[in-house]
Amino acid sequence: MAKIIGIDLGTTNSCVAVLEGDKVKVIENAEGTRTTPSIVAYKDSEILVGQSAKRQAVTNPKNTLFAIKRLIGRRYEDQAVQKDIGLVPYKIIKADNGDAWVEVNDKKLAPQQVSAEILKKMKKTAEDYLGETVTEAVITVPAYFNDAQRQATKDAGRIAGLDVKRIINEPTAAALAFGMDKKEGDRKVAVYDLGGGTFDVSIIEIADLDGDQQIEVLSTNGDTFLGGEDFDTALIDYLVEEFKKEQSVNLKNDPLALQRLKEAAEKAKIELSSSSSTEINLPYITADATGPKHLVINVTRAKLEGLVADLVARTIEPCRIALKDAGLSTSDISDVILVGGQSRMPMVQQKVQEFFGKEPRKDVNPDEAVAIGAAIQGAVLSGDKTDVLLLDVTPLTLGIETMGGVLTPIIEKNTTIPAKKSQVFSTAADNQPAVDISVYQGERKMAQQNKLLGNFQLGDIPPAPRGVPQIEVSFDINADGILKVSAKDKSTGKEQSIQIKANSGLSDAEIEAMIKDAEANAEEDRKFEELAKARNEADALVSSSNKAVKDLGDKVTEDEKTAITTAVSELEAATKENDVEDIKAKTEALQNILMPITQRAYEQAQGAGGAQGFDPNAFQGGDAGQQQKADDGVVDAEFTEVKDDKK
């Protein structure tokens, strides 16, 4: 059975893993690293993903998209989105359906499309390692993602050519990874997940049931717009203000300078986790009428901690709420697990230790634990692993709007999923012919202060006094945390239901169009790969041909030298164009000229004792002979790098 891979689709970095035997393998990408920057760049009709996109961000800030996860499944009018508009160098726009999209090179893109490029990179990374096509995956999301954000993540997977078998919460995945190697009996753990763009905390019980593990989420809480990006922004704002004081220039008006600042701030933040101070030195950051300006600012760890103190404090209240919802106190928690790159900050670790009263575990890799957990869940779904039972929860209350604009809960937050619950309602007026069902998600008492997930109408209700008709509303939430709602008139049996999608979101037609667009890009990638391979083989043959003519000397006639030189020139000219078939034809033509010459020289050398013999196979399509074997290695390495840069 094909493997189901686990993907941590992160705000800042992404990671992919797979279960092999009884061990999880975190897979290295083409660049040799186990995490890939969640950055996508659009440059000269090419799509760059990961490190190659990050490398060119400074020179292409408006077309380099990062932290796109913060937009997925969100409305343009959301306060969090409006805040981001002033912080990123790329353009965030309002789509026709009201969602937050981005615009690159005059092309409008949904966050799902951009995320799909990252998922395609993860898919390709896994396929290169496994040596087989991958079509199924478990993808992680922040525990506090709402229904629209979860559905949007599944759509991104679909656009990337993946059947998303399960959406799993990131803290839950980390607990799976933690529990796999820790056979320490029953215990309750707190997973504190501070990533690049989101924060979650989950209280999880790991129970040993006759040798099997049951991992049950007791409660979860968080903030989907709080993470390492906000820590970077706090430092960037400080640097901008300091520079403005010194030079009277506002760097926020310069996208190029802002991108350089972002890179420097991220680097400085990381350095300050292990050192007490660092210097940010950016020569020629900008220029005005008086000449070029240079930014040189020393930042201490204490200064950074002062800048982000309120951000760290914001993570503690969700911890308190999660404990309360689980009915536990800090003394009931046996282990605290830190996940997400931002959790490496010493101040964060100190505050978490102060709150829970115990030192966080250091034996969990915060960058890889989530992908490892996703891979374990993938193995459970495929049947490769049978000794783990995962019981997750819905993070937010689900309900409908009733008379007076009140939110009436149907499924309370922290209910174990999958779950199905029903409640009977009635009409608010005499002879009311229909009822409108508006479905909301959130914790506010007034319905419209929560997230509207969707609405529908149940009609043809027989005339009756108010309060008489019996309308049964049922909520059915699956293991992905995605909701289906139905309403049934118990007197007539008439029923109406909807699979909840965001009241915006992508339509099936839009998703299909994006899939076709992605497939078209895949075909372009395949053509580029074929072209690169043909060029590499041609270059190797040209090099071998020139060497052969030189080594054979007077064993080659003048007519043969002329024929070889002409064929080499024609092949070199062909490699400068994009016609694969022409390159292959001219490669074959050069081979046909060389083969009889080298064969003759080889036989003559053999007759003379073979001391200076030539191997005629050295010119057979660039695949045989020791010299070409060495070239093959070079071609493959070079090709992999080029392929990644062109995706």
From Swiss-Prot:
UniProt KW keywords: ATP-binding, Chaperone, Nucleotide-binding, Phosphoprotein, Stress response
PROSITE patterns: HSP70_1 (PS00297), HSP70_2 (PS00329), HSP70_3 (PS01036)
MF terms (GO), sorted A to Z: ATP binding; ATP-dependent protein folding chaperone; unfolded protein binding
Modified residues (Phosphothreonine): 198
Superkingdom field: Bacteria
Biased composition (Low complexity): 618-628
UniProt-listed SUPFAM superfamilies: Actin-like ATPase domain (SSF53067), Heat shock protein 70kD (HSP70), C-terminal subdomain (SSF100934), Heat shock protein 70kD (HSP70), peptide-binding domain (SSF100920)
UniProt-annotated stretches for the region Disordered: 603-647
Any Pfam family matching the protein: HSP70
Induction of the gene: By stress conditions e.g. heat shock.
Family: Belongs to the heat shock protein 70 family.
PANTHER family with a match to the protein in the record: HEAT SHOCK PROTEIN 70KDA
Function (record text): Acts as a chaperone.
NCBIfam families named among the record's database cross-references: PRK00290.1 (NF001413), prok_dnaK (TIGR02350)
Name of the protein in question: Chaperone protein DnaK
Source species of the chain: Acinetobacter baylyi (strain ATCC 33305 / BD413 / ADP1)
